[in-house]
A protein has these predicted regions:
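Catalytic Tyr-x(3-8)-Lys segment
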Residues: 202-228
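Substrate-binding pocket helix/loop in short-chain dehydrogenase/reductase
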Residues: 97-99, 103-108, 212-214
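Active-site helix of classical SDR
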Residues: 122, 159, 167
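Conserved glycine-rich cofactor-binding loop
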Residues: 7, 14-16
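Short, small/polar-rich loop/turn modules that mediate ligand/substrate recognition or access, typified
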Residues: 175, 180, 244-246
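Residue(s) in the substrate-gating loop at a strand-loop-helix junction
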Residues: 141
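Short C-terminal tail/terminal secondary-structure segment
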Residues: 4, 93-96, 233-234, 245-260
Length: 260
């Protein structure tokens, strides 16, 4: 599963799954464009890759900003002249609240970052990807694909379901260009994203469901790791997955089978 000589764009590369994937792809030989919403977080990931002997550039951009994403890919083209892998991973949990309490602005922000951001990440990659073909991997979630019991996650789940539909449409459209498009659906993974989730008054709509032994059967209830997800990203980016496209892969330790 070596990626020697290949170039990868990773969004949300400053932390969590994105950072782990950027490092994993670099260890496999890829040159990595580490993109995050802040310059500092992108720079730290790029520096870590270079410290391991890899090649990386840091890019700061809001994935929902069309001009910024177009400029980011132009920088990749100038730097390395090619693109082989896109990991469209950036996203937010947003606000989790009842439908009555969730504001239109909160709904729109989650959909804009997660779904429009994915569209722009793929759209502006195509001029480079079409030159040689390649692999696009999109981070969705168990929410909106198998799990619908997390109260208040209507905006988040809708954005994640939308990513799956988008990926399937893109996979068919881009197959003739030898571009594969697949989706990963992580369950409970130990990252920092939960810390930025705003949950409001969910007690009023939460169904009283309990899992005494924890929600993840494969790990005796505990979460998976970002490194495990990064290994899946590497597989889908590599030639080992050369005949896989338009497919969701759940990486959740059977959580969604229990909790959905």
């Amino acid at each position: 599963m070596e990626l020697d000589g290949k170039v990868a764009m990773v969004t949300g590369a400053g932390s969590g799954i994105g950072k782990a994937a950027a490092l994993r792809l670099a260890r496999a030989g890829a040159k990595v464009a580490a993109l995050d919403h802040t310059e500092e977080s992108a720079r730290k990931t790029a520096e870590k890759i270079r410290g391991l002997g890899g090649a990386a550039i840091a890019l700061a951009a809001d994935v929902s900003d069309a001009a910024a994403m177009q400029a980011a890919y132009e920088r990749v083209g100038r730097e390395w002249g090619r693109l082989d892998v896109v990991f469209a991973n950036a996203g937010i949990n947003g606000v989790w609240a009842s439908l009555e309490d969730l504001t239109p602005e909160e709904w729109a922000k989650t959909l804009t970052v997660n779904l429009t951001g994915t569209f722009l990440t793929v759209k502006y990659a195509l001029s480079l990807l079409k030159e040689r073909g390649g692999s696009v991997i999109i981070t969705s979630s168990v929410n909106g694909t198998r799990i619908f019991s997390n109260a208040g996650a209507s905006a988040y789940s809708s954005s994640k379901a939308g990513q799956v539909a988008f990926a399937k449409m893109a996979a068919l459209e881009l197959a003739k260009h030898r571009i594969r498009v697949n989706v990963i659906c992580p369950g409970w993974i130990k990252t920092e994203i939960e810390d930025s989730t705003e949950k409001r008054d969910l007690e009023e709509i939460q169904e009283p469901i309990e899992f005494p032994e924890g929600p993840v059967p494969l790990t005796d209830g505990g979460p998976g790791t970002a490194a495990q997800v990064a290994d899946l990203v590497l597989f889908l980016a590599s030639d080992a997955a050369a005949h896989i496209t338009g497919t969701e892969v759940w990486i959740d330790g059977a959580q969604s089978l229990l909790q959905g």
